[in-house]
Amino acid sequence: MIVISHVLGNVKTDPVWAEKLKAYELDYLTLEHGDMYKNSCRKMTEQGKDLGISLERNSLLADGDVLLCDDKHAYAIIVKLILRDVMIIDLTDLLNFSHEMMLKISFELGHALGNQHWKSIIHESQVFVPLSVSHKVMESVIQTHRFTGIHYRFEKGDSILSCLTPSEARLLFGGAEDLGAHVHVDHSHSHDFMGHSHEHEGHRHVHNHAGNSHDNEHDEHHSRR
């Protein structure tokens, strides 16, 4: 096992490293959003090198980080970060509204996001919400509320990483496998837990347990209290 205790540099942000490693054989350590905040972990590179990551507390690995550089053999190990997409909700137009309207819309937006149990952070005049369900479902939730003066778009997670503090990045991406993603829109909701999903509006259930699935149609109606 090769122990990695610090980052040497970054090929994405440092042109010196980018130029140096052009002629090197590059091996990649692929990390997903749940791994990037871990100070200590054991991972295999794409070429099968066994790495023991042991970084200082609050260190955060970034896409393009150089973990190992062997000049003798012209070989280097680079971090390849795969982050979930992020919905960016732009609140800039609210600054032109009255204080009362600004507070009202902000409160309603916070309630809508909280009702979905979606994590979010506010950065300047934007709210960042990591993708926990499909783009279509997240769009549906925002569109259902018909917020005035609010615009949204989706961006790749790594495109906003540089403007986040380590604690903010950890909140949005770290260890956040949303095993129980709830979506509540009007009188329908869906759950996705370990392959178990429900849809209520009609009324249909689809279950998938350990490779076994069954589809049940229900005629009965549910009332919500």
Curated annotation (Swiss-Prot):
Coiled-coil stretches: none
InterPro entries: UreE, UreE_N, UreE_N_sf
Transcription regulation listed as a keyword: no
Gene transcribed to yield this protein: ureE
Family: Belongs to the UreE family.
GO cellular component: cytoplasm
Disulfide linkage: none
GO molecular-function terms, A-Z: nickel cation binding; unfolded protein binding
Domain of life according to the entry: Bacteria
Function: Involved in urease metallocenter assembly. Binds nickel. Probably functions as a nickel donor during metallocenter assembly.
Disordered: region residues: 189-225
Source species of the chain: Edwardsiella ictaluri
HAMAP family linked: UreE
Stretches with biased composition (Basic and acidic residues): 189-202, 212-225
Keyword Chaperone among record annotations: yes
GO biological process terms on file: protein folding
Keywords associated with the record: Chaperone, Cytoplasm, Nickel, Nickel insertion
Pfam assignment, any one: UreE_N
SMART domains with a match to the protein in the record: UreE_N (SM00988)
Subcellular location: Cytoplasm
Protein name, entry field: Urease accessory protein UreE
